[in-house]
Structure formats: structure tokens, C-alpha cells
Design a protein with these regions (language model features):
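Alpha/beta-hydrolase fold catalytic core
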Residues: 1-38, 61-62, 99, 129, ...
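Conserved HGGG/HGGXW glycine-rich cap/lid loop of the alpha/beta-hydrolase fold
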Residues: 23-74
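Conserved catalytic-core motifs of eukaryotic protein kinase domains, centered on the activation segment
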Residues: 50-52, 75-80, 138-141
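Short, hydrophobic alpha-helix immediately C-terminal to the catalytic nucleophile
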Residues: 52, 90, 114-118
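Flexible "cap/lid" loop of the alpha/beta hydrolase fold
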Residues: 114, 118-119, 125-157
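Helix-loop "lid/cap" segments that line or gate small-molecule binding pockets
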Residues: 150-155, 164-171
């Protein structure tokens, strides 16, 4: 099946309003059965569409949820820290009656997955991390390291295509 067809089969975006943090978070939810669902957290510059192949593969097998992190997809931009975002993930899952999930995080989503799993461990059945690391053990509230500041600045100034081409050159 062609990628365009797979994208077109994605579940529609839904919006969760977190009143604790006053933020709207977009997400996709493909409910299949009452088994433990799989929650996917995307990497930097990704969104819930990043998991299109996983939605396609698990259709008819498992329930799948993919959340757009703040500032990605249709989620409100925010400067919230990862602990706060992990609480939003927890609140969103509670709002859709998910009491346990298998958690998959890629890159930045993997860093978030580690925090979700450590702070909301009763919610997590399994954790799978892809292309992530534990961070640099920097104190909460520390400024980002220079390479990440530069990447964020480049992202603000470029179109999706320009930024994608730049990132490919740097791989």
C-alpha cells in the first residue's frame, strides 16, 4: 500500500483540553478492543502522523494512540517542562479511560516516555525506547545545550521542506 493511502486511513485528530495546564493537545486514537493499547510518542519535528505505519499494522489487532506533543501537530505551543507534559499525557489517557498501556517513545518521545513511566508507573505495562537517551542529567530548568537551541532557531525560520533538507544533510 502506498504511503499516501496509509496517511489517509489515519484516525481523525481529536482534541484534549487539559484544564490543569490550560493547553489543548491533539491526538489520534484507533480503538480496536479492550486489550492494553499502545501509546506512541513522536520525536522532535514529528507528530502523530509519524506513526502512520504503526496505525496501519495494528489495525484490527490492537488499539493505538498517538499524541502530538505541545507545539507539534495541532497541539498548542508551550514552554512546559517534560514533567508537566508527562502529567498531560497521564490526564489525556485518564480522559479516554485508559488505565494501562504499552508505551513506545522515539527520540524526544523516548525521553518523555521515560518520565511518564517513572512518574506514572501504574499506567505503564511495557516501555519501548527508540533512538533516545537518558539526557545529560541537567537540573530541571537548565537552559538547553547550544546545538538544540540552534536547531530550534533554525526550525522557527525555515519551512518544513527547508528544515527537512537541512536535517538530512546533517545526518
Amino acid at each position: 500500500m502506498h504511503f499516501t493511502e496509509i496517511i489517509n486511513q489515519l484516525p481523525q485528530l481529536k482534541i484534549f483540553k487539559d484544564n490543569t495546564y490550560n493547553i489543548q493537545i491533539s491526538y489520534r486514537y484507533q480503538k480496536f478492543n479492550e486489550e492494553i493499547p499502545i501509546l506512541f510518542l513522536h520525536g522532535f519535528n514529528g507528530n502523530s502522523k509519524s506513526w502512520a505505519y504503526q496505525f496501519h499494522y495494528f489495525k484490527g489487532r490492537r488499539s493505538v494512540i498517538a499524541i502530538d506533543a505541545p507545539g507539534f501537530g495541532q497541539s498548542d505551543p508551550s514552554d512546559l517542562d517534560m514533567l508537566s507534559i508527562s502529567n498531560i499525557v497521564y490526564n489525556l489517557l485518564k480522559s479516554i479511560d485508559v488505565t494501562k498501556c504499552d508505551l513506545v517513545g522515539h527520540s524526544m518521545g523516548g525521553m518523555l516516555a521515560q518520565i511518564v513511566a517513572s512518574k506514572h508507573s501504574k499506567l505503564i505495562n511495557k516501555v519501548i525506547l527508540s533512538c533516545t537517551h537518558k539526557g545529560y542529567a541537567m537540573p530541571v530548568g537548565s537552559s538547553l545545550r547550544d546545538p538544540y537551541k540552534l536547531r530550534l532557531e533554525e526550525r522557527k525560520q525555515m519551512s518544513n521542506k527547508e528544515f527537512g533538507q537541512l536535517r538530512i544533510q546533517k545526518m
